[in-house]
């Protein structure tokens, strides 16, 4: 069963909002033969321009489902989040079930979800089955700090850059966020 931890930033989470989130995101349970014991972390944030940002993260045993959406209408944003999460589950379900079938194991996910859902998303599933790596690249990581890595990323015109952090000697990644700012991912051992 999926439990919910719902937090609001600049917004009070009313029973109506809580119920709507639990009802919509809770529908993901239908994709599992054995519903995992999971916690859905939901953060709802409102901004001064009345835009709402909804983030949902559901860590499972082998995968973390995560979706984020900004919308003027909170409820429409929740619907869009649910659609994104369903696409992620279907994509993952297809891969996992294929792998387990090849090994002769029982499917982890429900083989068929309502026929209407399957028909509506047949194109999505077909394109998700064909993962094709079209280019492979090898390079050595240079030691630098995160500011230097951002400069290198911008010089190359990329959206991310992998480097060896000079201070920690670990592999790190800087990336450009949707809001134009930068993020840093640091690896741990």
Curated annotation (Swiss-Prot):
Q: Name one GO molecular function term.
A: ribosomal small subunit binding
Which InterPro entries does the record match to this protein? Answer: HPF/YfiA_ribosome-assoc (IPR050574), HPF_long/plastid (IPR034694), RHF-like (IPR036567), RHF/RaiA (IPR003489), Ribosom_S30AE_C (IPR032528), Ribosom_S30AE_C_sf (IPR038416)
Keyword Cytoplasm carried by entry: yes
One Pfam short name: Ribosomal_S30AE
Keywords for this protein? Cytoplasm, Translation regulation
Taxonomically, the superkingdom here is Bacteria
The UniProt function text for this chain reads:
Required for dimerization of active 70S ribosomes into 100S ribosomes in stationary phase; 100S ribosomes are translationally inactive and sometimes present during exponential growth.
How would you summarize the oligomeric state and partners of this protein? Answer: Interacts with 100S ribosomes.
Protein name, as recorded: Ribosome hibernation promotion factor
Gene field: hpf
């Amino acid at each position: 069963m999926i439990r919910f931890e719902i937090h609001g930033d600049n917004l009070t989470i009313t029973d109506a909002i809580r119920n709507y989130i639990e009802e919509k995101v809770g529908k993901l349970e239908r994709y599992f033969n054995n519903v995992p014991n999971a916690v859905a972390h939901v953060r709802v944030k409102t901004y001064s321009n009345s835009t709402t940002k909804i983030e949902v993260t559901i860590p499972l045993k082998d995968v973390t489902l995560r979706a984020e959406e900004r919308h003027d209408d909170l409820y429409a944003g929740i619907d869009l989040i649910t659609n994104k999460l369903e696409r992620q589950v279907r994509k993952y379900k297809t891969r996992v079930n294929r792998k387990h079938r090849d090994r002769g194991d029982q499917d982890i996910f429900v083989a068929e979800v309502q026929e209407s859902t399957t028909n509506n998303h047949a194109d999505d599933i077909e394109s998700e089955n064909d993962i094709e790596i079209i280019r492979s690249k090898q390079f050595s990581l240079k030691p630098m700090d995160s500011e230097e890595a951002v400069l290198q990323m911008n010089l190359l015109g990329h959206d991310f850059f992998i480097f060896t952090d000079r201070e920690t000697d670990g592999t790190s990644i800087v990336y450009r966020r949707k809001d134009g700012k930068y993020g840093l991912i640091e690896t741990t051992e």
